[in-house]
Amino acid sequence: MHMTDVLPAGDISKAVEAFAAPDSFNHKKFFEMCGLKSKGPDVMKQVFGILDQDRSGFIEEDELCLMLKGFTPNARSLSVKETTALLAAGDKDGDGKIGMDEFVTLVSES
């Protein structure tokens, strides 16, 4: 499954382009711009499944770094600062990774 199977390609492109500059990523604005925030939990879970590249049931720090690439392959990687901030925002139980429920909460609260 590809991200464009669940979200409009145009919205994804606009969102990724808006945060092309290093250290410009804002997860709240990104989730809104790509259209994910307005979707229900089922779509959010599909997106989680795409971002969880190793199928561990969690999005770990190395996968968070590649999050924009999960939306479109030619996107940049997140910086260490951006990755750390995203993990801090989403990791509600402090285990160093983001589970599916945490991801849905992260997107919904954005």
UniProtKB/Swiss-Prot annotation:
It comes from the Eukaryota. GO terms for molecular function: calcium ion binding. It holds the Pfam family EF-hand_7. It comes from Aquarana catesbeiana (American bullfrog). Keywords: Calcium, Metal-binding, Muscle protein, Repeat. GO terms for cellular component: cytoplasm. Ca(2+) 2 binds at D91, D93, D95, K97, E102. Residues 39-74, 78-110 form the EF-hand domain. This parvalbumin has an isoelectric point of 4.97. In muscle, parvalbumin is thought to be involved in relaxation after contraction. It binds two calcium ions. This is Parvalbumin alpha. CDD domains: EFh_parvalbumin_alpha. PROSITE patterns: EF_HAND_1, EF_HAND_2. Belongs to the parvalbumin family. The lineage of its organism: Eukaryota, Metazoa, Chordata, Craniata, Vertebrata. Ca(2+) 1 binds at D52, D54, S56, F58, E60, E63. Coiled coil: none annotated. InterPro entries: EF-hand-dom_pair, EF_Hand_1_Ca_BS, EF_hand_dom, Parvalbumin.
